[in-house]
Amino acid sequence: MGAKTGLLVYADGDVPGLLRRVGAADLDRTATMMRQLYPGREIEQREGSNLGDGVYPPEGTVCAASWPGVEVIGDQEVMIDAPSRLPEHLVAASTGRRLVLHAMHSVVDWLAFAVWEDGRLVRSLSLSPDSGIIENIGEPLPFELPYWAGDRPADIIPWPGEEEEPYALPFHPLELGEDALRALCGFIQEGRPEPDDVDADAIELYGFHVRDPYGPGPAEQEAKLRRAVEDTDPPRFYALSPDGSLVERDGL
């Protein structure tokens, strides 16, 4: 699975229903929202994206759109281990409406989602196989129940040379993550789409470069990235064998 999200949605009601009815977002309205949600930051418009891709924009980029009744923000900064610690000003902006946070990263099988109603946290879950359950606040939502009941166990293929071991969680976080994204926002990243899913690729988001004026500059960030790449081991490639196991191979 290659799904990654860092998503906030503010809404006056049911998010999927509202997103099904949106048209082109107003740029001035969206820019005003950005200034409210990113106080003290330098904000510069750049190339946008669609909702399907904009839920995980490049670092330092925010993809966003504001319509009457619903606002969408895609930003890696909201991918936090404990959703209950979302910055207070972001939660305060949800007064009188619903706020949904959805974040997942396929590399580490991590999922986090949360729901606030009128500024009050009603549900938060964050978990990964390496860290276990990081946060679990409130009662499980209906789409979660089959997972906690053991009806959706993780189906994991072991790496070559490793014995199959029980998965560290009773279900796969990314599978729950897709169901959470559909239930809370109306669309998915991976998997089989359903007829009434929101067409995320048809919803356009504006792009913004967001920078802390007191943070590292572009040259320093590029140097840091270059050092990280140099320290990374070369990639290894695997393919499925006829018996369903993984076999290492040379290159793609």
Predicted feature residues:
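Surface-exposed polar/charged interaction patches
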Residues: 25, 96, 187-191
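Long, compositionally biased intrinsically disordered terminal regions
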Residues: 104, 110, 118-252
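Alpha-helix boundary/interfacial micro-motifs
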Residues: 23, 28-29, 85-86, 136-137
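Short loop/turn segments at secondary-structure transitions that flank enzyme active sites
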Residues: 14-16, 79, 130-131
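Short, extreme N-terminal segment that most often corresponds to the first beta-strand
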Residues: 1-33, 249-252
